[in-house]
Protein backbone atom coordinates (compact mmCIF):
# COMPACT_ATOMS: atom_id res chain seq x y z
CA UNK A 1 0.00 0.00 0.00
CA UNK A 2 1.37 3.43 -0.93
CA UNK A 3 2.16 5.74 1.97
CA UNK A 4 0.47 9.12 2.47
CA UNK A 5 0.42 11.57 5.34
CA UNK A 6 -1.80 14.31 6.76
CA UNK A 7 0.15 17.50 7.48
CA UNK A 8 -2.78 18.90 9.43
CA UNK A 9 -2.88 16.06 11.93
CA UNK A 10 0.90 16.03 12.23
CA UNK A 11 1.26 19.69 13.13
CA UNK A 12 -1.35 19.18 15.85
CA UNK A 13 0.82 16.39 17.29
CA UNK A 14 3.94 18.55 17.05
CA UNK A 15 2.14 21.45 18.67
CA UNK A 16 1.13 19.11 21.51
CA UNK A 17 4.78 18.08 21.99
CA UNK A 18 5.87 21.70 21.78
CA UNK A 19 3.45 22.87 24.45
CA UNK A 20 4.40 20.12 26.89
CA UNK A 21 8.13 20.71 26.40
CA UNK A 22 7.71 24.43 27.08
CA UNK A 23 8.32 25.99 23.69
CA UNK A 24 6.41 29.18 23.03
CA UNK A 25 4.18 29.54 19.99
CA UNK A 26 3.05 32.83 18.53
CA UNK A 27 1.02 33.54 15.39
CA UNK A 28 1.66 36.74 13.46
CA UNK A 29 -0.92 38.87 11.66
CA UNK A 30 -3.82 38.21 14.02
CA UNK A 31 -6.93 40.32 13.70
CA UNK A 32 -6.21 42.12 16.98
CA UNK A 33 -2.59 43.13 16.68
CA UNK A 34 -0.24 44.11 13.90
CA UNK A 35 3.00 42.34 13.06
CA UNK A 36 4.90 45.40 14.31
CA UNK A 37 3.13 45.22 17.68
CA UNK A 38 3.90 41.53 18.03
CA UNK A 39 7.55 42.01 17.11
CA UNK A 40 7.87 44.96 19.50
CA UNK A 41 6.31 42.95 22.32
CA UNK A 42 8.71 40.12 21.59
CA UNK A 43 11.75 42.38 21.96
CA UNK A 44 10.43 43.74 25.27
CA UNK A 45 9.85 40.19 26.47
CA UNK A 46 13.38 39.18 25.54
CA UNK A 47 14.99 42.14 27.33
CA UNK A 48 13.03 41.41 30.49
CA UNK A 49 14.26 37.83 30.78
CA UNK A 50 17.96 38.41 31.33
CA UNK A 51 18.84 34.93 32.49
CA UNK A 52 18.20 33.29 29.10
CA UNK A 53 19.14 34.06 25.52
CA UNK A 54 16.11 33.93 23.26
CA UNK A 55 15.97 32.62 19.71
CA UNK A 56 12.97 33.56 17.61
CA UNK A 57 12.17 31.32 14.66
CA UNK A 58 10.04 32.41 11.70
CA UNK A 59 8.29 29.43 10.12
CA UNK A 60 5.27 29.52 7.79
CA UNK A 61 1.52 29.01 7.99
CA UNK A 62 0.17 26.82 10.76
CA UNK A 63 -1.22 24.42 8.15
CA UNK A 64 2.11 24.11 6.32
CA UNK A 65 5.27 22.06 6.80
CA UNK A 66 7.64 24.70 8.21
CA UNK A 67 5.53 25.40 11.30
CA UNK A 68 5.51 21.85 12.75
CA UNK A 69 9.20 21.36 11.92
CA UNK A 70 9.94 24.62 13.73
CA UNK A 71 8.03 23.20 16.67
CA UNK A 72 10.28 20.14 16.68
CA UNK A 73 13.42 22.32 16.64
CA UNK A 74 12.14 24.49 19.50
CA UNK A 75 11.20 21.41 21.47
CA UNK A 76 14.70 19.94 21.11
CA UNK A 77 16.37 23.22 22.03
CA UNK A 78 14.14 23.96 25.02
CA UNK A 79 14.74 20.54 26.57
CA UNK A 80 18.30 21.74 27.28
CA UNK A 81 17.60 25.34 28.27
CA UNK A 82 18.85 24.59 31.77
CA UNK A 83 22.26 23.78 30.24
CA UNK A 84 22.80 26.28 27.42
CA UNK A 85 20.43 29.02 28.71
CA UNK A 86 18.76 29.45 25.31
CA UNK A 87 14.99 29.67 24.99
CA UNK A 88 13.23 29.09 21.67
CA UNK A 89 10.02 30.78 20.53
CA UNK A 90 8.15 29.73 17.41
CA UNK A 91 6.08 32.06 15.24
CA UNK A 92 3.83 31.36 12.28
CA UNK A 93 4.40 33.67 9.31
CA UNK A 94 3.56 34.30 5.69
CA UNK A 95 6.42 32.12 4.45
CA UNK A 96 9.85 32.38 2.84
CA UNK A 97 9.82 35.90 1.38
CA UNK A 98 8.32 37.42 4.53
CA UNK A 99 10.76 35.47 6.69
CA UNK A 100 13.82 36.61 4.78
CA UNK A 101 12.79 40.26 4.90
CA UNK A 102 12.02 40.12 8.62
CA UNK A 103 15.30 38.31 9.26
CA UNK A 104 17.20 41.12 7.57
CA UNK A 105 15.41 43.60 9.85
CA UNK A 106 16.52 41.57 12.92
CA UNK A 107 12.94 40.66 13.77
CA UNK A 108 13.84 36.96 13.69
CA UNK A 109 17.02 35.11 14.60
CA UNK A 110 16.52 32.12 12.29
CA UNK A 111 13.94 31.46 9.58
CA UNK A 112 12.79 28.80 7.17
CA UNK A 113 13.22 29.64 3.50
CA UNK A 114 12.75 27.75 0.28
CA UNK A 115 16.16 27.23 -1.27
CA UNK A 116 15.61 29.42 -4.35
CA UNK A 117 14.32 32.31 -2.23
CA UNK A 118 17.42 31.97 -0.06
CA UNK A 119 19.54 32.43 -3.19
CA UNK A 120 17.43 35.31 -4.51
CA UNK A 121 17.59 37.20 -1.20
CA UNK A 122 21.37 36.81 -1.00
CA UNK A 123 21.82 38.03 -4.57
CA UNK A 124 19.10 40.70 -4.45
CA UNK A 125 17.27 39.41 -7.51
CA UNK A 126 13.70 38.48 -8.49
CA UNK A 127 11.31 39.50 -5.70
CA UNK A 128 14.25 40.89 -3.70
CA UNK A 129 15.53 43.23 -6.42
CA UNK A 130 14.24 46.32 -4.59
CA UNK A 131 15.60 45.00 -1.29
CA UNK A 132 19.12 44.82 -2.75
CA UNK A 133 21.51 41.92 -1.99
CA UNK A 134 21.78 40.56 1.54
CA UNK A 135 25.47 39.56 1.77
CA UNK A 136 25.09 38.76 5.48
CA UNK A 137 22.63 35.90 4.95
CA UNK A 138 24.04 32.65 6.34
CA UNK A 139 22.90 29.02 6.16
CA UNK A 140 22.36 26.87 9.23
CA UNK A 141 21.30 23.57 7.65
CA UNK A 142 19.28 22.02 4.85
CA UNK A 143 15.91 20.47 5.56
CA UNK A 144 13.52 18.42 3.44
CA UNK A 145 13.70 18.19 -0.34
CA UNK A 146 10.67 18.82 -2.55
CA UNK A 147 11.46 16.84 -5.71
CA UNK A 148 9.52 17.02 -8.94
CA UNK A 149 7.05 14.18 -9.43
CA UNK A 150 6.73 13.12 -13.06
CA UNK A 151 3.68 10.86 -13.22
CA UNK A 152 2.32 8.63 -15.99
CA UNK A 153 -0.17 5.79 -16.18
CA UNK A 154 1.23 2.47 -15.08
CA UNK A 155 0.62 0.94 -18.52
CA UNK A 156 2.42 3.81 -20.27
CA UNK A 157 5.40 3.10 -22.51
CA UNK A 158 7.13 6.17 -21.07
CA UNK A 159 10.14 4.98 -19.05
CA UNK A 160 12.36 8.08 -18.97
CA UNK A 161 12.17 11.85 -19.31
CA UNK A 162 13.45 11.63 -22.87
CA UNK A 163 10.42 9.49 -23.74
CA UNK A 164 8.27 12.61 -23.31
CA UNK A 165 9.27 13.74 -26.79
CA UNK A 166 6.26 13.90 -29.11
CA UNK A 167 3.89 13.35 -26.17
CA UNK A 168 1.09 15.42 -24.68
CA UNK A 169 2.26 16.68 -21.29
CA UNK A 170 1.19 19.08 -18.56
CA UNK A 171 3.73 20.79 -16.33
CA UNK A 172 0.98 22.63 -14.45
CA UNK A 173 -0.47 26.08 -14.98
CA UNK A 174 1.80 28.76 -16.42
CA UNK A 175 3.01 30.20 -13.09
CA UNK A 176 3.26 26.88 -11.25
CA UNK A 177 6.54 26.38 -9.41
CA UNK A 178 7.20 23.04 -11.09
CA UNK A 179 6.80 24.78 -14.45
CA UNK A 180 9.61 27.21 -13.60
CA UNK A 181 11.84 24.39 -12.40
CA UNK A 182 11.33 22.20 -15.44
CA UNK A 183 11.99 25.19 -17.72
CA UNK A 184 15.52 25.33 -16.28
CA UNK A 185 16.04 21.67 -17.12
CA UNK A 186 14.65 22.08 -20.64
CA UNK A 187 17.13 24.90 -21.27
CA UNK A 188 20.01 22.65 -20.24
CA UNK A 189 18.65 19.88 -22.49
CA UNK A 190 18.19 22.46 -25.29
CA UNK A 191 14.56 21.41 -25.65
CA UNK A 192 11.71 23.71 -26.67
CA UNK A 193 7.96 23.25 -26.89
CA UNK A 194 8.57 21.70 -30.31
CA UNK A 195 10.01 18.61 -28.63
CA UNK A 196 6.52 17.80 -27.36
CA UNK A 197 3.35 17.02 -29.26
CA UNK A 198 1.55 19.46 -26.98
CA UNK A 199 2.12 21.20 -23.65
CA UNK A 200 -1.13 21.76 -21.79
CA UNK A 201 -1.47 24.26 -18.93
CA UNK A 202 -3.62 22.34 -16.48
CA UNK A 203 -4.27 23.41 -12.90
CA UNK A 204 -2.63 21.17 -10.34
CA UNK A 205 -5.92 19.96 -8.87
CA UNK A 206 -6.96 18.59 -12.28
CA UNK A 207 -3.70 17.02 -13.42
CA UNK A 208 -4.19 13.57 -11.89
CA UNK A 209 -7.69 13.18 -13.33
CA UNK A 210 -6.38 14.26 -16.75
CA UNK A 211 -3.63 11.65 -16.83
CA UNK A 212 -6.01 8.98 -15.49
CA UNK A 213 -8.45 9.85 -18.30
CA UNK A 214 -5.64 9.62 -20.90
CA UNK A 215 -6.12 13.26 -21.88
CA UNK A 216 -2.40 13.75 -21.29
CA UNK A 217 0.48 11.28 -21.32
CA UNK A 218 2.35 12.73 -18.34
CA UNK A 219 1.92 15.35 -15.62
CA UNK A 220 4.36 17.13 -13.34
CA UNK A 221 3.69 17.98 -9.70
CA UNK A 222 5.68 18.83 -6.58
CA UNK A 223 6.10 16.04 -4.06
CA UNK A 224 4.88 18.37 -1.30
CA UNK A 225 1.46 18.53 -2.96
CA UNK A 226 0.99 14.83 -3.69
CA UNK A 227 -0.99 14.00 -0.56
CA UNK A 228 -3.72 16.41 -1.63
CA UNK A 229 -3.76 15.34 -5.27
CA UNK A 230 -3.63 11.58 -4.72
CA UNK A 231 -5.96 11.23 -1.73
CA UNK A 232 -9.05 10.69 -3.92
CA UNK A 233 -7.30 8.64 -6.60
CA UNK A 234 -9.71 6.28 -8.34
CA UNK A 235 -8.84 2.66 -7.57
CA UNK A 236 -9.00 1.89 -11.28
CA UNK A 237 -6.29 4.44 -12.07
CA UNK A 238 -2.81 2.97 -11.65
CA UNK A 239 0.06 5.44 -11.85
CA UNK A 240 3.85 5.39 -11.64
CA UNK A 241 6.72 7.82 -11.20
CA UNK A 242 9.26 8.43 -13.95
CA UNK A 243 12.82 9.29 -12.95
CA UNK A 244 14.24 12.73 -13.74
CA UNK A 245 17.97 12.11 -13.73
CA UNK A 246 21.07 12.05 -15.89
CA UNK A 247 23.89 14.31 -17.02
CA UNK A 248 21.65 17.31 -17.65
CA UNK A 249 20.23 17.15 -14.12
CA UNK A 250 23.79 16.88 -12.76
CA UNK A 251 24.76 19.97 -14.77
CA UNK A 252 21.72 21.94 -13.60
CA UNK A 253 22.23 21.14 -9.92
CA UNK A 254 25.90 22.10 -10.21
CA UNK A 255 25.17 25.41 -11.95
CA UNK A 256 22.21 26.37 -9.73
CA UNK A 257 23.08 25.19 -6.19
CA UNK A 258 19.62 25.91 -4.81
CA UNK A 259 18.51 22.76 -6.63
CA UNK A 260 19.21 19.38 -5.09
CA UNK A 261 18.82 15.74 -5.99
CA UNK A 262 16.29 13.60 -4.19
CA UNK A 263 14.12 10.54 -4.74
CA UNK A 264 10.84 8.78 -4.06
CA UNK A 265 11.23 5.70 -1.90
CA UNK A 266 9.76 2.35 -2.85
CA UNK A 267 6.03 2.54 -2.13
CA UNK A 268 6.06 6.26 -1.32
CA UNK A 269 2.79 7.86 -2.48
CA UNK A 270 2.38 5.33 -5.32
CA UNK A 271 2.98 1.58 -5.33
CA UNK A 272 6.40 1.97 -6.93
CA UNK A 273 8.46 -1.24 -6.90
CA UNK A 274 11.74 0.66 -6.57
CA UNK A 275 13.32 3.99 -5.64
CA UNK A 276 12.82 6.69 -8.30
CA UNK A 277 15.33 9.55 -8.62
CA UNK A 278 14.39 13.18 -9.17
CA UNK A 279 15.47 16.70 -8.23
CA UNK A 280 13.96 19.98 -7.14
CA UNK A 281 14.08 22.67 -4.51
CA UNK A 282 14.17 22.20 -0.77
CA UNK A 283 13.72 23.90 2.57
CA UNK A 284 16.62 25.61 4.31
CA UNK A 285 17.17 27.08 7.76
CA UNK A 286 18.98 30.43 7.59
CA UNK A 287 20.15 33.28 9.81
CA UNK A 288 22.03 36.56 9.58
CA UNK A 289 25.78 36.52 10.22
CA UNK A 290 25.05 38.69 13.28
CA UNK A 291 22.92 35.96 14.88
CA UNK A 292 24.71 34.65 17.98
CA UNK A 293 27.21 31.88 17.10
CA UNK A 294 26.36 30.26 20.43
CA UNK A 295 22.67 30.07 19.52
CA UNK A 296 23.35 28.64 16.07
CA UNK A 297 25.88 26.15 17.44
CA UNK A 298 23.38 24.76 19.94
CA UNK A 299 20.51 24.68 17.44
CA UNK A 300 22.60 22.54 15.08
CA UNK A 301 23.96 20.45 17.95
CA UNK A 302 20.51 19.57 19.30
CA UNK A 303 19.19 18.61 15.87
CA UNK A 304 22.21 16.46 15.00
CA UNK A 305 22.53 14.78 18.40
CA UNK A 306 18.82 13.90 18.28
CA UNK A 307 18.77 13.25 14.55
CA UNK A 308 16.69 10.06 14.55
CA UNK A 309 14.10 11.60 16.85
CA UNK A 310 14.09 14.75 14.71
CA UNK A 311 13.46 12.76 11.53
CA UNK A 312 10.71 10.68 13.10
CA UNK A 313 8.56 13.63 14.15
CA UNK A 314 7.53 14.69 10.65
CA UNK A 315 7.22 12.58 7.45
CA UNK A 316 8.92 15.20 5.30
CA UNK A 317 12.09 14.76 7.38
CA UNK A 318 12.24 11.00 6.97
CA UNK A 319 14.75 11.04 4.11
CA UNK A 320 17.09 13.63 5.63
CA UNK A 321 20.72 12.62 5.39
CA UNK A 322 23.00 13.99 8.10
CA UNK A 323 25.86 14.34 5.62
CA UNK A 324 23.73 16.67 3.47
CA UNK A 325 22.86 19.15 6.22
CA UNK A 326 25.63 21.67 5.35
CA UNK A 327 25.26 21.31 1.59
CA UNK A 328 21.92 20.29 0.02
CA UNK A 329 20.29 23.29 -1.64
CA UNK A 330 22.63 25.64 0.23
CA UNK A 331 23.75 28.55 -1.95
CA UNK A 332 24.94 31.02 0.72
CA UNK A 333 27.87 30.78 3.17
CA UNK A 334 27.40 28.75 6.33
CA UNK A 335 26.99 30.56 9.65
CA UNK A 336 30.15 30.49 11.84
CA UNK A 337 28.22 28.76 14.64
CA UNK A 338 27.13 26.02 12.25
CA UNK A 339 30.64 25.67 10.83
CA UNK A 340 32.05 25.18 14.32
CA UNK A 341 29.72 22.27 15.07
CA UNK A 342 30.04 20.65 11.64
CA UNK A 343 33.83 20.74 11.96
CA UNK A 344 33.66 19.21 15.44
CA UNK A 345 31.75 16.17 14.16
CA UNK A 346 33.65 15.86 10.88
CA UNK A 347 30.94 16.96 8.44
CA UNK A 348 33.24 19.79 7.38
CA UNK A 349 37.01 19.67 7.18
Task: Name each model feature, range by range.
Residues 52-80, 86, 146-213, 308, ...:
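Bilobed "Venus flytrap"/periplasmic-binding protein-like clamshell domains
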Residues 28-58, 158-168, 336, 343-344, ...:
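Immediate post-signal peptide segment of exported/extracytoplasmic ligand-binding proteins
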Residues 24-26:
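Bacterial signal peptide processing site
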Residues 206, 213-214, 223-241, 252-254, ...:
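An extracytoplasmic/periplasmic, membrane-proximal ligand-sensing/linker region
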Residues 2-11:
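Bacterial N-terminal signal peptides that target proteins for export
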Residues 105-145, 224-228:
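Acidic, polar ligand-binding/catalytic clefts
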Residues 115-117, 125-127, 156, 193-286, ...:
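Pocket-lining segment of extracytoplasmic ligand-binding domains
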Residues 44-114, 120:
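N-terminal (or domain-start) structured segment
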Amino acid sequence: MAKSYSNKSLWIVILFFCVFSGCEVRELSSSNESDAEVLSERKIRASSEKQNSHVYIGTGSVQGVYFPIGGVICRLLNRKTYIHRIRCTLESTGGSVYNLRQLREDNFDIVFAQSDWQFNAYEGISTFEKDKPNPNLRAVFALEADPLALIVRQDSEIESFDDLQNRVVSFGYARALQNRIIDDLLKVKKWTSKNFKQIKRINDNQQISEVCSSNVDAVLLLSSSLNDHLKDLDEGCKLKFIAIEGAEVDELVKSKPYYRKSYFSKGEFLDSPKKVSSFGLGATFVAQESTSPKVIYHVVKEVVENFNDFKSLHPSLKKLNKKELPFAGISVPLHPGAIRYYEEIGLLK
